[in-house]
């Protein structure tokens, strides 16, 4: 039995190893400071948002959904503005993009993380990357020069690979539009398979893919105009964008 006076507190600790009681209060207060209080609707939303962020030895990822969905490059990029940028969390933003860019295979982001293995079957994820950089600039106030310094190499790899042609029969046609896939692949968000065959392969010229493609080209040109006017890619990307527009 312990008698407490008004304003006093007591810490109860249970564990498998003996700890120094002198550090309990400091550890408790540090943990309390790191938590988001549930004292408003906004704070409750922030707390719910951070529950989808997973920090592991391999890097920082985002769950696509509970209970069984793992991380997905497409869903991560789609969710970053709402879950991360709205709170101004630049640290988590950069951690998420570092994991995605560190685990790229050619111009592709991993679209599925399952049993410690990565799968790369999405044509749109690399293009969503450009829209996320636009949101990064818009919502956190970074400059185009900063965007290019941090992510210019990845931007170039994606655009040039798609222009020259790459895996999954992805290629730029004479009219500038982006062609992707074959009858045995499902490279867009409509990627349900049955008996080894995609229900909706959507081979060819998908409207939302080409909208993202055009946006990526135009945004990259805007960034280069401010960050590196002497870069020869600016003419190539602008020429392809003009063909798409025509």
Question: Can you say where each PLM-predicted feature lies in the sequence?
Answer:
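Acidic, mature catalytic/reactive cores of soluble proteins
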Residues: 1-246
């Amino acid at each position: 039995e312990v008698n407490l006076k008004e304003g006093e507190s007591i810490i109860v600790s249970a564990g498998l190893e003996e700890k120094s009681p002198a550090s309990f209060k400091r550890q408790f207060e540090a943990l309390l400071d790191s938590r988001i209080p549930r004292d408003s609707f906004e704070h409750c939303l922030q707390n719910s948002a951070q529950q989808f962020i997973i920090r592991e030895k391999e890097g920082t990822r985002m769950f696509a959904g509970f209970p069984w969905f793992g991380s997905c490059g497409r869903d991560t990029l789609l969710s970053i503005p709402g879950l991360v940028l709205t709170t101004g969390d630049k640290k988590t933003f950069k951690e998420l993009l570092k994991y995605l860019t560190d685990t790229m295979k050619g111009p592709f982001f991993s679209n599925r993380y399952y049993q410690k293995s990565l799968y790369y079957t999405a044509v749109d994820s690399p293009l969503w990357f450009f829209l996320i950089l636009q949101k990064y600039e818009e919502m956190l106030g970074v400059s185009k020069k900063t965007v290019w310094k941090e992510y210019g190499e990845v931007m170039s790899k994606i655009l040039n690979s798609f222009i020259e042609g790459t895996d999954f029969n992805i290629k730029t046609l004479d009219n500038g539009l982006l062609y992707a896939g074959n009858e045995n692949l499902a490279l867009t968000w409509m990627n349900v398979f049955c008996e080894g065959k995609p229900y909706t392969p959507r081979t060819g010229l998908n409207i939302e893919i080409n909208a993202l493609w055009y946006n990526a080209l135009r945004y990259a040109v805007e960034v280069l105009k401010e960050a590196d006017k002497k870069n020869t890619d600016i003419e190539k990307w602008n020429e392809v964008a003009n063909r798409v527009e025509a």
